[in-house]
Amino acid sequence: MRKLKQYFVLLLLLSSSVAAADVTEQKVDSIFKATDPFKADLSTMQNVGSVMSDDGKLRIVSWNNRSENGTFEYYNYFIYKKRSKDKPTVKKFTAKNAALPKNKGKYNANNWYGCLYYKAVAVKGGYMLLGYQTYRDISRVKIIEPLNINGERFTLGDDVFEKAASGKKKESRAVFEYSNNAVMNISYEPKEKRFVFDHLSPENPNLKGMFQYYGPDFTYDALTLKKNVGPLQRI
């Protein structure tokens, strides 16, 4: 009887979480319809994050949720104003079942993998975004990827990440998966126009490729922004 009671308590908590996510989405949609989404005050909304790009033209609003079946859900709004007098363009991305993003390929509102974006750096033709994701309990993911904006089309990913100094092999984004017990830091250095971040290694050489056992090894890597990004450099 006690186990049955605990089960129903768990179901209630999960259903409440799903309902809260739906209410949050409806409330944000309502606010954006009633006022300028570029300036809308969302500070009273719990768990809803908002970041502005370094050029002040792109606002990103996002939050996440754990669904009743254990999957991770992500909600994201890109709000773009090329000029201050322009009406903002709003594009909503949702992922009801987050998945590990692929290094190669592009994503849009119809096939997005799901993450929280916490920094946007203006580059030629768009932005370079930093994202954070949980798609399973045993690992965490950090992402560096381009956002291209063309009218009302918002596309994530572009083949600008050089895998080698030759520049012959390119990827669409940088994806770093590591242990859920570890912390990986990525910072942007505007003067050098580069991202600097922890180098990840398995806790044991025999665990190579099993990213849930990866973590910082107290060395650092860098990706420099130029015509293309990279190649990866140890610093």
Regions found by a protein language model. Name each.
Residues 57-63, 126-133, 193-199:
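Short beta-strand elements that form the blades of beta-propeller/WD-repeat-like
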Residues 105-107, 112-121, 135, 155-222:
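Short aromatic loop motif centered on NTY/YTY
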Residues 20-78:
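Start-of-domain marker
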Residues 74-82, 143-151, 211-226:
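Beta-propeller blade signature
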Residues 77-121:
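Short N-terminal edge-element motif at the start of the domain
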Residues 128-129, 134-154:
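Mid-length scaffold segments of soluble, non-membrane domains
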Residues 88-96, 155-167, 232-235:
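Beta-propeller fold detector
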Residues 1-27:
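Bacterial Sec-dependent N-terminal signal peptides
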